[in-house]
């Protein structure tokens, strides 16, 4: 730009020269190169979901090195209380059985609350006919985000990042082998459940069970 001004001026004062306006300087390629993917707009809820009304789930892995026989971990998090369940998996094929077992356990522990919606990714273990048939028989609505649009399941994915941000420093501080990540992830999950969140002044455990969590073991 400065070179063009100098060449066009031929040594004459700039006040006699035409100055290009900003709209004449726009570079389409530069603008396109700086584009970013905006987060998907949050769906406006008429009212906040009740406990267990909406559960988000996701699987992280494969992780190398494995933690014993485990190479994955699965998270389930309640959209209302942020209460969570984390389990280690040796294979993604076990996700359906673990999810089914947790649903049965939650329905037995909290008979006054109904699981209405489960949002999970499009992995084969969550799109199988067996999983669809079970959810249909129990009145659970399955929600799948658009493929490769991770922001549509951001609650589960952000929870996974939260776990990792706690587990990694634990491993580094204690200078223990990375293969112990499974224990670190489970410990991080237990710490998150007993701490108040940015959404509530109470911990997820207190919101779920109605009493303060026991922290005597810490």
Predicted regions and their residues:
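HHCC-type zinc-binding knuckle of retroelement integrases
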Residues: 1-218
């Amino acid at each position: 730009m400065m070179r063009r001004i100098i060449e066009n001026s031929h040594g004459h004062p700039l006040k006699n020269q035409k100055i290009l306006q900003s709209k004449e300087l726009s570079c389409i390629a530069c603008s396109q190169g700086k584009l970013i993917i905006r987060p998907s707009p949050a769906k406006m809820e008429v009212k906040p979901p009740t406990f267990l009304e909406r559960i988000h789930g996701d699987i992280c892995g494969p992780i190398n090195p494995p933690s014993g026989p485990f190479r994955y971990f699965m998270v389930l998090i309640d959209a209302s209380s942020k209460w969570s369940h984390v389990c280690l998996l040796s294979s993604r094929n076990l996700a359906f059985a673990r999810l089914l077992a947790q649903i049965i356990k939650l329905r037995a522990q909290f008979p006054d609350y109904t699981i209405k919606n489960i949002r999970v990714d499009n992995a084969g273990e969550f799109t199988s006919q067996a999983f669809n048939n079970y959810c249909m028989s129990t009145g659970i609505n399955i929600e799948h985000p658009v493929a490769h649009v991770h922001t549509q399941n951001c609650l589960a994915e952000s929870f996974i990042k939260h776990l990792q941000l706690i587990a990694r420093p634990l491993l580094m501080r204690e200078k223990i082998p990375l293969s112990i990540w499974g224990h670190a992830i489970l410990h991080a999950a237990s710490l998150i459940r007993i701490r108040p969140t940015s959404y509530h002044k109470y911990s997820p455990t207190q919101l779920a069970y109605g009493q303060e969590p026991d922290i005597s073991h810490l």
